[in-house]
Amino acid sequence: MAGTWDMLGTGGPVIVILALMSLLSLTVIAVKLIQLWPVRSGGQAREQALTQWKGGDRKQAQDSIADGKSPADRVMAYAMQALQEGLRGPLLQDELQRRGNEEVSRMNSLIRLLELIAMVSPLLGLLGTVLGMIQSFQELELAQGAANASVLAGGIWQALLTTAAGLLVAIPAAIAAGLFAARIDAAAQAIESAAGRLLLIDGSR
């Protein structure tokens, strides 16, 4: 623990900012993991519901996905209820599109923040390094040549510390943002597939 505080003191305010950004990034990653974990679930239940709907057992089809936790389950459940109430055609398609967009927008929340952290952290680290190098050379100049190589090397490694810290913050954030984006894309495709197949089945009956 003492080493961590020493590192924060050595890196100056830039390290403190990066530490706060790291804490924010880890918090966002944890929140998104909880939110996005179930978004690709329910595929088997939706297949069963579509089979039941095609066979004319609409009530059983609705019951099959009533407890679904994925966005595709929610959109399909709404579509089935709307069809039961007689809503069809462009009005239903527009409403399904709107609901699908809302689900995708909800899943995408905070992803931009992760991407921003991944982009800004290395730049902050580089800024800290540049400022540290400037300070080191200023101290060398004030020493008027009396400083030895070890003193100069100590100033340089302290300056490079912020670059390493910036990368340590950015890399997990970038990886998480990419993985989350891929999961969201798959969930969006599941929404489109579920709604489209239901409308196709209903229209062919």
What kind of region is each of these model predictions?
Residues 1-47:
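Hydrophobic membrane-targeting segments
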Residues 4, 103, 148:
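Glycine-rich, flexible loop/turn motifs
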Residues 12, 26, 61, 76, ...:
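Residue-level signature of catalytic and energy-coupling elements of molecular machines
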Residues 40-124, 131, 135-145, 178-205:
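Predominantly long cytosolic amphipathic alpha-helical stalk/bundle segments
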Residues 150-181:
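Pore-lining and gate-forming transmembrane alpha-helices of multi-pass membrane transport proteins
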